[in-house]
Amino acid sequence: MKTIAVIGWKNSGKTTLVSNLVKFYKEKKIKVGVVKHAHHSFDIDHPNTDSYKIRKSGAYKTTLVSDKRLALMEEKITPDIQLGSLIDLNKDCDLLIFEGFKSYDELIKLEVHIKKNDKDYLYKSINNVKYLVTDDDLDHPIQTFNHSQIDKIASEIYNENS
């Protein structure tokens, strides 16, 4: 399976780029999984549902299944994230896109940057950043694209990464 991490400062366009890449790959019949890093606690389940009651009773894993969707909720015992486990959960995908995960050196990264954020480039301080998507006109020491080059970005990611 091919993997890539899309990183960048808040409001740089990461989610927009990931969504556009997913649409591009879907048209090409490439099965894409996305793992989104959340910096805050979240809950996809709701009180007064059977699954919520089961999970709150102490189930380590609760899986909801319908004819159209599957959701797995796993209670984390430790705060660390096991990259291998996330990859295993998505092993039926052709490409796995991680949104965030900039501290994971083993992932090849694509940085999304916009001038108006007035932030420095992450590739200067983060390991394994191979691509940059930006709206500036500067020369950079890594392969650079503009935000509208979705087909070129998608092709480069899929053809070069493994």
What function would you assign to each model-found segment?
Residues 22-77:
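N-terminal phosphate/diphosphate-binding loop that engages ATP/GTP or pyrophosphate donors
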Residues 6:
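Hydrophobic anchor at the beta1->P-loop junction of P-loop NTPases
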Residues 17-18:
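Post-Walker A alpha-helix
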Residues 3:
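Walker A (P-loop) ATP-phosphate-binding motif of ABC ATPase nucleotide-binding domains
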Residues 14:
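Conserved lysine of the Walker
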Residues 74-104:
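Phosphate-binding/switch loop-helix module in NTP-utilizing enzymes
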Residues 95-162:
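Phosphate/Mg2+-binding loops and adjacent switch elements
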Residues 10:
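The conserved Walker
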